[in-house]
């Protein structure tokens, strides 16, 4: 057992903000002591976006009933879960980075006392371009996602990483936060 519990870096922000790209950027550049948790999602593995564990609805429900998840949420018709391995890593003193949900932040904060939220966003224009380019949603869904993005605000006192420019620029800022272990909210 570690002397110190690791930090859970809870990354969140609107669809199209570039969270998956930034997390991949950080993952390639951080040492092995920082774990990047895969999400378990009821979305096909080849749907694009993040590297996740694809589960059928039935398998997800069975794992949830079996206590395999430390945190579960449902958004946009999909079920998402963080595996209990997240708690094991934290207990061993490892820092863990997760791609979380804005609406599930209160649940996550109650479950993980060492949670530090990171808010990643982009301008409405950039969000719109990225959502159209990824071609996962139709026009009506994109408009709903943009309206939802405008309705969410970062938690009080939370620093915001605006990812409108080059990936390396925002990625290096994210790396400084993760390496520094400083409180950003």
Curated annotation (Swiss-Prot):
Keyword Transit peptide belongs to the record: no
Functional note: Catalyzes the phosphorylation of ribose 1,5-bisphosphate to 5-phospho-D-ribosyl alpha-1-diphosphate (PRPP).
Gene name in the database record: phnN
Species of the source: Chromobacterium violaceum (strain ATCC 12472 / DSM 30191 / JCM 1249 / CCUG 213 / NBRC 12614 / NCIMB 9131 / NCTC 9757 / MK)
Record-stated family: Belongs to the ribose 1,5-bisphosphokinase family.
Reactions listed under catalytic activity: alpha-D-ribose 1,5-bisphosphate + ATP = 5-phospho-alpha-D-ribose 1-diphosphate + ADP
Name of the featured protein: Ribose 1,5-bisphosphate phosphokinase PhnN
EC number from the UniProt entry: 2.7.4.23
InterPro entries attached to this UniProt entry: GK/Ca_channel_bsu, P-loop_NTPase, PhnN
Sample GO molecular function, one term: ATP binding
Keywords from the named record: ATP-binding, Nucleotide-binding, Transferase
């Amino acid at each position: 057992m570690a002397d110190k519990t690791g930090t859970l870096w809870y990354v969140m922000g609107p669809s199209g903000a570039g969270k998956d790209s930034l997390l991949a950027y950080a993952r390639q550049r951080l040492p092995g002591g920082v774990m990047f948790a895969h999400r378990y999602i009821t979305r096909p593995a080849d749907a694009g976006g993040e590297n996740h564990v694809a589960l059928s609805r039935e398998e997800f429900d069975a794992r949830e009933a079996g206590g395999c998840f430390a945190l579960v949420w449902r958004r946009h018709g999909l079920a998402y879960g963080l595996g209990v391995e997240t708690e094991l890593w934290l207990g061993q003193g490892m820092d863990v980075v997760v791609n979380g949900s804005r609406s599930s932040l209160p649940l996550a904060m109650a479950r993980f006392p060492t949670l530090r939220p990171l808010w990643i966003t982009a301008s409405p224009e950039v969000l719109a371009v990225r959502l159209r380019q990824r071609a996962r949603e139709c026009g009506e869904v994109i408009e709903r996602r943009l309206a939802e993005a405008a309705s969410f605000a970062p938690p009080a006192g939370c620093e915001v990483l605006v990812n409108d420019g080059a990936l390396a620029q925002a990625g290096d800022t994210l790396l400084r936060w993760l390496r520094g272990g400083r409180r950003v909210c």
